[in-house]
């Protein structure tokens, strides 16, 4: 996939995650660790504007100078920023303006990639920006789910996924591994998280890993079997958290 195609794919995927949201859903901040959906859309756009368009596109026109303060996160070298716990108090810019902001930056980025995408430093920064946005896609979904979990009617993020799949999970088996010194971390040009680089050696103790993921049906069995009340099923720190927070079920389903 070309760099231009990768850019378009990642940017459109972010928007697709928001397609079931109403305008009112975009601005809610349900706790300090949650960012409103509109902030994610703006911040990932600001990243491309700040670290690619401004240094590499001399004729680029900044969409709004105030966005630099509003949508910086923790990039202290880039300047000051609006406090994270107060992001939900920003009723302006409105949602439609942030979508225009994304269009503005996408158009400029497309031109930049076509004209300078073969420069190693530009290609590297575009890749970094795409990985950054893909990380925010996960955060975006996590934050939307938390916002909806606070509503007494428990709205679904994607109502189309409410029907259970017409299949059963294969038997879960565990494969034992002896452990040892392994080289871990990202390699190649694919997606990775920030903490997956640089690639390095580390000691891994002997372990066993399941052949598949846990299903929500199995998790329901754990709840019904008093899994949250049985200390033998938890590590000491986990059990302390269960007791301290009064957990008896997942935060949302």
Positions of PLM-derived features:
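Extended beta-strand/loop cores of jelly-roll/beta-sandwich
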Residues: 2, 6, 15-21, 25, ...
């Amino acid at each position: 996939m070309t760099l231009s195609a990768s850019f378009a794919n990642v940017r459109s995927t972010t928007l697709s995650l928001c397609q079931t949201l109403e305008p009112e859903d975009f601005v809610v901040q349900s706790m300090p660790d949650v960012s409103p959906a509109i902030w994610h859309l703006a911040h990932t756009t600001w990243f491309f504007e700040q670290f690619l368009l401004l240094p590499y596109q001399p004729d680029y026109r900044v969409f709004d100078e105030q966005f630099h303060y509003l949508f910086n996160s923790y990039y202290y070298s880039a300047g000051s920023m609006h406090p994270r716990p107060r992001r939900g108090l920003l009723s302006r810019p409105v949602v439609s303006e942030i979508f225009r902001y994304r269009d503005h930056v996408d158009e400029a980025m497309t031109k930049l990639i076509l004209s300078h995408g073969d420069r190693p430093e530009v290609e590297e920064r575009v890749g970094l920006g795409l990985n950054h946005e893909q990380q925010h896609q996960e955060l975006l979904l996590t934050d939307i789910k938390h916002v909806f979990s606070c509503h007494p009617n428990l709205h679904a993020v994607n109502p189309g996924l409410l029907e259970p799949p017409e299949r059963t999970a294969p038997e879960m088996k565990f494969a034992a591994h002896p452990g040892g010194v392994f080289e871990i971390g990202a390699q190649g040009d694919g997606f990775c998280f920030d903490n997956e680089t640089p690639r390095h050696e580390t000691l891994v103790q002997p372990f066993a890993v399941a052949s598949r993921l846990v299903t929500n049906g199995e998790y329901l069995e754990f709840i019904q079997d008093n899994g949250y009340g049985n200390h033998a099923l938890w590590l000491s720190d986990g059990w302390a958290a269960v007791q301290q927070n009064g957990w008896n079920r997942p935060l949302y389903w």
